[in-house]
């Protein structure tokens, strides 16, 4: 039988956090907020970057890692620079193979701020890796996370709502 939209349940069994890998992206005291996916408008990364000043006001030792590639990369980098986020946002580029799994294990929070998302395999993978997850209240993401039970939801396209959910996890989960 084929299971549509499934994930390999054995993918992260026995896998520990690789601190050497993690230190490529953040200092030990920093909490990694991870976005992994295509850098296109509907993935909502621009809203996550817009949320960072409020996130940092609520939790200074946070760092956003953006892993992926896509047509918005230059626009997103310019947005981060315009907001003065400098060392608090890191563009990791495309990750493949075992680096994807290592990055999930390195993350403290994963965020999927899509404005349109039919399903959201990446959110399932993050949750399977044991990473607290924030998703938008749209499409399939809305169906896989129960707010404040197995993740947090935020209003799609709303940086303030996104920041509130992320800061809540940073302050209360860790």
PLM regions and their residue ranges:
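Carbohydrate-associated surface elements
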Residues: 6
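A short helix/loop element that forms part of the nucleotide-sugar donor recognition site in Leloir-type
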Residues: 13-26
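A conserved mid-protein helix/loop that constitutes part of the nucleotide-sugar donor-binding site
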Residues: 31-54, 64, 71-77, 160
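Nucleotide-activated donor-binding/catalytic signature segment of Leloir-type glycosyltransferases, i.e.
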Residues: 75-95
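Short alpha-helical donor nucleotide-sugar binding micro-motif in glycosyltransferases
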Residues: 94-95, 102-107
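Aromatic "clamp/platform" in nucleotide-sugar-dependent glycosyltransferases that forms part
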Residues: 115
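Short hydrophobic beta-strand element within catalytic cores of glycosyltransferases
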Residues: 132-135, 145
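Conserved acidic donor-binding segment of nucleotide-sugar-dependent glycosyltransferases
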Residues: 147-148, 152-159, 168-174
